[in-house]
UniProtKB/Swiss-Prot annotation:
The gene is atpB. This is ATP synthase subunit beta, chloroplastic. Its EC number is 7.1.2.2. It catalyses: ATP + H2O + 4 H(+)(in) = ADP + phosphate + 5 H(+)(out). ATP binds at G172, G173, A174, G175, V176, G177, K178, T179. Keywords: ATP synthesis, ATP-binding, CF(1), Chloroplast, Hydrogen ion transport, Ion transport, Membrane, Nucleotide-binding, Plastid, Thylakoid, Translocase, Transport. Gene3D superfamilies: 2.40.10.170, Bovine Mitochondrial F1-atpase, Atp Synthase Beta Chain, Chain D, domain 3, P-loop containing nucleotide triphosphate hydrolases. It is found in: Plastid, Chloroplast thylakoid membrane.
């Protein structure tokens, strides 16, 4: 008789159970496991450790093989806490990489890095699983069409428009509005485009995971009454979990998004919040695996790890994946290796300014620092391009004049410069926009502004049609 133990998508038969190793060393979340001669697990295979701790509580830890050490030993990284594990405990090689449930049944649910639900709504009823390590699509499969992805957010659509099927980075320090902007984008895209989103929370704090979840339920992006009508699947690797979980939760989210693209042939929006914590988790794991650190203490494989994860997030002829990634900028330094490495892969960058946030202008997007490969007249059209350039030129001149204004005052400027300053301030205030997901805090109903309306509004400010109106108007 062959007995089977169900674990996620794996059914570990007695035949596989014969490939059992044992723990020889535990260093925090990193484990060394000895296996039988000739039966060493492959790189990225998942190992399952079951047993009891000293208090008699059941333990169930999944690890991923990272290094083959020789002498029939491998080094693995745990995906959950290793508290209670002891040397000599058995470790079962599943014979395959970690696989997670995919498909419509994941919508409206919160899963961890292993694909297990953590929202107390019962198991995810999915018969389909995908391994989290998958190859990027071949070049011949890629979709090379260029089209704008309208977000309904004025300053984004005008200054640095997003490409459908592109990769977008939201750059900003702490507290400038990255998470709110991501949640607003999920809301707008679900309602205006009818697409599905996958939100990958990498190293999330409680607030960062809980607040968007509650806001999505309020805005019906997650439908509690009929969960199957939800438009987003959430995957969280929490901050209190080992670095292995944060390092792989992005791969789990990408895998779920790839199913909607490749099988359902849908347009998908994976949101990664934050990509920096993926880098930090990789740095921790790299140090624990004994690799020499590189610049600023980051892992020497930073470029390779970033490239392998980013290349999977792409559009094919079957469907598009438009990825939006929040990039925390340490100490507001854009030259730090983490944001610098990330920006090399992006089609558009939306930079959030602390100065604008301090003025109460939200979303605090800086049109001068934000860039997009779509900002070309032959892609967006002459009218859009000229308007965006006019906004940037006016904002740049205002920025140049700020030191003079601070020292000598506004009255010392020429008439032309005073007009420029007045128009730049109107542009700043016109760029702000009430958010759907922040209605409960601001008391102002959210607004979705189409691209033609956005262009028309800025075109009225630039030549001075609205010079007679006060800034507050």
């Amino acid at each position: 008789i062959v007995t089977k133990t169900s674990f996620l998508s794996f059914e570990i038969s007695e035949l596989v159970k014969k490939n059992v190793g044992y723990i020889t060393q535990i260093i925090g979340p990193v484990l060394d496991v000895a296996s039988s001669p000739g039966k060493m697990p492959n790189i990225y295979n998942s190992l399952i450790i079951k047993g009891q701790n000293s208090a008699g509580q059941e333990l169930n830890v999944t690890c991923e093989v990272q290094q083959l050490l020789g002498n029939n030993e491998v080094r693995a990284v745990a995906m959950s806490a290793t508290d209670g594990l002891t040397r000599g405990m058995g470790a079962v090689d599943t014979g395959a990489p970690l696989s997670v449930p995919v498909g419509e049944t994941t919508l409206g649910r919160i899963s961890n890095v292993l694909g297990e639900p953590v929202d107390n709504l019962g198991p995810v009823q999915s018969s389909t699983t995908f391994p989290i390590h998958r190859s990027a699509p071949a070049f011949i499969q890629l979709d090379t069409k260029l089209s704008i992805f309208e977000t309904g957010i004025k300053v984004v659509d005008l200054s640095a428009p997003y490409r459908r099927g592109g990769k977008i980075g939201l750059f900003g320090g702490a507290g400038v509005g990255k998470t709110v902007l991501i949640t607003e984008l999920i809301n707008n895209i679900a309602k205006a485009h009818g697409g599905v989103s996958v939100s990958g929370g990498v190293g999330e704090r409680t607030r960062e995971g809980n607040d968007p979840y509650m806001e999505m339920k309020e805005s019906k992006v997650i439908n509690e009454q009929n969960i199957s009508e939800s438009k987003v699947a959430l995957v969280y690797g929490q901050m209190n979990e080992p670095p292995g979980a944060s390092m792989r939760v992005g791969s789990t989210a990408s895998t779920m998004a790839e199913y909607f693209r490749d099988v359902n042939k849908q347009d998908v929006l994976p949101f990664i919040d934050y990509i920096l914590r993926f880098v930090q988790a990789g740095s921790e794991v790299s140090a624990l695996l004994g690799r020499m650190p590189s610049a600023v203490g980051y892992q020497p494989t930073l470029g390779t790890e970033m490239g392998s994860s980013q290349e999977r997030i792409t559009s094919t002829k079957d469907g598009s994946i438009t990825s939006i990634q929040a990039v925390y900028v340490p100490a507001d330094d854009l030259t730090d290796p983490a944001p610098a490495t990330t920006s090399a892969h992006l089609d558009a960058t939306t930079v959030l300014s602390r100065g604008l946030a301090a003025k109460g202008i939200y979303p605090a997007v800086d049109p001068l620092d934000s860039t997009s490969t779509m900002s070309q007249p032959w892609i967006v059209g002459e009218e859009h391009y000229e308007t965006a350039q006019g906004v940037k030129q006016t904002s740049q001149r205002y920025k140049e004049l700020q030191d003079i204004i601070a020292i000598l005052g506004l009255d010392e400027l020429s008439e032309e410069d005073r007009l420029t300053v007045a128009r730049a301030r109107k542009i700043e205030r016109f760029s702000s926009q009430p958010s759907f997901v922040a209605e409960v805090f601001t008391g102002s109903p959210g607004k979705y502004v189409s691209l033609p309306e956005t262009i028309k509004g800025f075109q009225m400010i630039l030549p001075g049609e609205l010079d007679n109106l006060p800034e507050q108007a």
